[in-house]
Regions:
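Ligand-binding pocket segment of bilobal, Venus flytrap-like solute-binding proteins
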Residues: 211-308
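Short beta-strand-loop
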Residues: 422, 448-488, 507-514, 531-537, ...
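Early extracytoplasmic/lumenal segment of secretory-pathway proteins
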Residues: 3-4, 11-22, 26-130, 137-138
């Protein structure tokens, strides 16, 4: 787990961090933890650990510092010291459902939790029905702030659809997915492409999936199981999903890629629209595409801003609930109540607004209204839908697993000699990597296609540094053969990373299926050790998605502390993908789960 501790420590790293060389990516579904201390001093005997969703984690860190320094007292005269850790909502929900484990989950066990939406409370409650533990106290949650789900679009594209005069909804997204931009007089923009997160881990992905099902039925409340399983509803949602570029576990991945394209004067070349929390659109327009609040108003603003389109056929208000957990003692419950009351005071609510949130009553600040193009300064009524029941929400997630856009993935595994080195736990890196790769096969949909390559350098048995072992084929037909082939890999030779990445992407391009998410996943424990192809700049030019008419994303996984993570990050960023950090081999299984969430 990637952990940040201490008030003076480094800031949270976002999923993609802009650098002069490109975008450096880190694993978003891993916990990023930061504890803060304030001026209340060592006499504060009540310690409260709050776990926050990532998009407001920076702000809660700031406000916890302010609270700790405020000198506030609880009813019994004691004072509390609040510390904050931050975790994506879906990951935190799973941790709470299993029973929080600090070592496994990478953060202290919280006594209070504030996810992005009460949808996660609904899912956690449902999971708790099969457990002998109490997962929630039953207390009514307090909303700290709000932010509606919105469709972020580059302004020229939104205007081409009719924004802001015309009401735009999910049916317009479906129509554009089917007909492309040529239907609106812009064939130069090509296909309509949608950025959307995985609903199992991301609130915006979950909310967008729920909203699409509601739009399919024309309802705004009381969605039923029969309506979720109705063939017409499923066809509608499947049609929306067909336009997805690829799935992600954090919407900042899309925002970072948009910012890079914008910086190169190609803002309309990447995604036509991204389903996100409205607040992230504000951050993007204010120069912070990755959500780093230090850049808010100071980072480079985009040449082509995004506007917030609120679907007229239904969207959800994300309510940022604050709940006390069963792990809290009586004193911690009192501290949680006082901290939440502090957060609802006018000064703190104003800080939420300045960061692009609406206040807990749904009122937009002037900064947000101007930044994202809210009609009537944000006073126009939104077409809000009611959150579905736990049973229906579970059915929506199950349906998405079937209806989502399917993938065509080429898995490229490093079999260089260094993979024989120990990885801990009595196994080699090769053994740990094979185990993780085999386990990951169970995360794909049966209709997803997966192929396998291996690479090192030339050996006595192989005249090329890379070799195709199995071409992509559906998991339902080829899983057993993939398992056998992965388990049969052996390690020798050096690491011909650059030439393999280039060849793998070209192979994926030659077999490109436009109706699928096409991707390459490279797992390596080292750095390039191949003199015949040792020019990183040339590789980055060859795979640069902004310079190619067609491109395939290359997701990289750094496996071992010898892996060249910076270079792997540049490779992935050049293809508008993500690099994942598994330099601690103990986390490789969780890393692979995160990788597969892109598909």
């Amino acid at each position: 787990m990637n952990r940040r501790t201490g008030e003076q420590g480094p800031r949270r790293l976002p999923l993609l961090v802009a650098t002069a060389m490109g975008l450096v990516a880190i694993l978003a579904t891993f916990l990023v933890t930061r504890e803060v201390s304030g001026g209340s001093g060592p006499d504060c005997g009540v310690r409260l650990e709050v776990n926050s969703s990532t998009e407001k984690g920076d702000l809660l860190v700031e406000l916890a510092q302010k609270y700790n320094a405020s000198g506030r007292e609880l009813a019994d005269g004691k004072c509390a010291r609040v510390t904050v850790s931050e975790t994506s909502s879906g990951v935190a929900m799973d941790a709470l459902a299993q029973g929080w484990d600090e070592k496994r989950d990478g953060a202290p066990e919280p006594q209070a939790w504030t996810p992005t939406s009460s949808l996660w409370l609904t899912l956690l409650t449902e999971k708790g029905t099969t457990s002998d533990r109490t997962v929630l106290t039953g207390d009514k949650p307090v909303s700290l702030a709000t932010s509606p789900l919105a469709i972020a679009m580059p302004r020229p594209m939104a205007e081409a659809v009719g924004w802001p005069q015309k009401k735009i909804g999910w049916r317009d997204i479906l129509s554009l997915t089917e007909k492309g931009w040529g239907s609106l007089g812009h064939p130069e923009w090509g296909r309509f492409s949608l950025g959307k997160d995985n609903p199992h881990t991301s609130t915006s992905g979950l909310a967008a999936t729920v909203a699409a099902f509601y739009a399919a039925t024309g309802r705004s409340s009381d969605l039923t199981l029969d309506q979720v399983t109705d063939p017409k509803s499923r066809a509608f949602v499947s049609g929306v999903e067909a336009g997805v570029l690829h799935y992600a576990s954090d919407a900042t991945a899309y925002m970072a890629n948009l910012a890079e394209a914008d910086a190169k004067g190609q803002a309309l070349s990447y995604a036509s629209a991204v389903t996100v929390q409205e607040q992230l659109i504000h951050l993007y327009n204010q120069g912070s595409p990755t959500g780093d609040v230090k850049l808010l108003g100071k980072g480079k603003k985009p040449k082509v801003p995004l506007v917030a389109v609120h679907p007229d056929d239904g969207t959800l208000m994300l309510d940022h609930p604050f709940v006390v957990l069963p792990s809290a003692s009586r004193e911690q419950r009192a501290a949680a109540a006082d901290f939440s009351a502090f957060l609802l005071e006018a000064a703190q609510q104003r800080r939420f607004q300045q960061h692009g949130f609406r206040d807990h009553e749904g009122n937009a600040g002037r900064e947000l209204a101007a930044s994202v193009g809210l009609p009537d300064e944000g006073k126009r009524k939104l077409s809000l839908i009611d959150p579905p029941s736990a049973q229906v929400l579970g059915a929506i997630l199950d349906s998405w697993d079937e209806l989502r856009k399917k993938a065509r993935v080429l898995l490229v595994m490093d079999v260089s000699g260094s993979m024989n080195q120990p990885a801990g736990g009595g196994q080699s890196r090769m053994e740990a990597a094979k185990k993780a790769a085999v386990a990951a096969l169970g995360l794909y949909h049966p209709d997803d296609e997966v192929g396998l390559w291996a690479f090192s350098t030339e050996t006595a048995d192989h005249r090329e540094p890379y070799r195709e072992i199995l071409p992509p084929r559906p998991i339902k037909a080829g899983k057993n053969q993939l398992v056998t082939s992965i388990n049969g890999l052996s390690a020798e030779g050096g690491t011909a990373l650059y030439t393999t990445v280039r060849a793998a992407q070209q192979a994926a391009l030659s077999g490109l299926d436009a109706d699928r998410i096409n991707a390459v996943v490279v797992l390596t424990d080292g750095k390039n050790e191949y003199p015949a192809d040792n020019d990183l700049d040339a590789l980055l030019r060859d795979i640069d998605a902004t310079q190619l008419e067609r491109s395939v994303r290359v997701f990289t996984v750094a496996f071992s502390d010898q892996a060249d993570f910076d270079t792997l990050s540049e490779i992935s960023a050049a293809t508008r993908a993500t690099s994942y950090d598994a330099r601690d081999p103990a986390v490789i299984d969780k890393v692979m789960v995160s990788v597969i969430s892109n598909f």
